[in-house]
Amino acid sequence: MQIILLEKIGGLGNLGDIVTVKNGYARNFLIPAGKAKRATEANMKEFEVRRAELEAKQAEILADARVRQEKLDGQTVTVAQKAGVDGRLFGSVTNADIAAAIVAAGIEAVKANVRLPNGPLKAVGEYEVEVALHTDAVAKITVAVVAATE
């Protein structure tokens, strides 16, 4: 299905690009989320009329993400979890746990933004983690996983 992108989407394209995606991806995710519209003549004309408005909105979203990126870059977030004597955790530290720690530090984040390329953290230590606040704004933070004291 051919669609018009209403915002920049990583790995797909920029605002205004006409791209071909699988029908299910367009119908079930992109169109309902307001990230794209079908590439019909009427929608293309409507997009051209609203282009400046959409570009301004995207610039504002990116500027907000850059501000949050500057606050987050280089920060250390501590997460306490029960651990054995050998340093292995009982359970694991997931992206939801890290997002909750970031929010507790006073910076807006959701678990979908936290990138754990090697999966959940399963041992005590310090880990470099990326927080993708926007396609063009990725902050690198240090997550210190410590053994919880009771």
UniProtKB/Swiss-Prot annotation:
Biological process according to GO: translation
Superkingdom, taxonomy of origin: Bacteria
InterPro entries membership: Ribosomal_bL9 (IPR000244), Ribosomal_bL9/RNase_H1_N (IPR009027), Ribosomal_bL9_bac/chp (IPR020594), Ribosomal_bL9_C (IPR020069), Ribosomal_bL9_C_sf (IPR036791), Ribosomal_bL9_N (IPR020070), Ribosomal_bL9_N_sf (IPR036935)
Keyword Repeat: no
GO molecular function: rRNA binding; structural constituent of ribosome
Keyword line: Ribonucleoprotein, Ribosomal protein, RNA-binding, rRNA-binding
One cellular-component annotation, GO: ribosome
Pfam families (alphabetical): Ribosomal_L9_C, Ribosomal_L9_N
Family annotation (PANTHER family): 50S RIBOSOMAL PROTEIN L9 (PTHR21368)
Record's function text: Binds to the 23S rRNA.
Xref: NCBIfam families: L9
Family, per entry: Belongs to the bacterial ribosomal protein bL9 family.
Protein name: Large ribosomal subunit protein bL9
